[in-house]
Every structure is written in structure tokens, then in C-alpha cells.
From Swiss-Prot:
Assembly mode: Component of the cytochrome c oxidase (complex IV, CIV), a multisubunit enzyme composed of 14 subunits. The complex is composed of a catalytic core of 3 subunits MT-CO1, MT-CO2 and MT-CO3, encoded in the mitochondrial DNA, and 11 supernumerary subunits COX4I, COX5A, COX5B, COX6A, COX6B, COX6C, COX7A, COX7B, COX7C, COX8 and NDUFA4, which are encoded in the nuclear genome.
GO CC, one annotated term: mitochondrial inner membrane
Biological-process GO terms, alphabetical: oxidative phosphorylation
Protein name: Cytochrome c oxidase subunit 7A, mitochondrial
Keywords: Membrane, Mitochondrion, Mitochondrion inner membrane, Oxidoreductase, Transmembrane, Transmembrane helix
Length: 15
């Protein structure tokens, strides 16, 4: 997978 911690960080901020 394409694990992207950066994307997860943005996802949390968006939540």
C-alpha cells in the first residue's frame, strides 16, 4: 500500500 502519513495528517485536519 501506499501508506502516506502526510495524507493521513491532512485527513485528520479535514475531519
Amino acid at each position: 500500500x501506499n501508506y502516506v502519513p502526510e495524507a493521513q495528517k491532512l485527513f485528520q485536519a479535514h475531519n
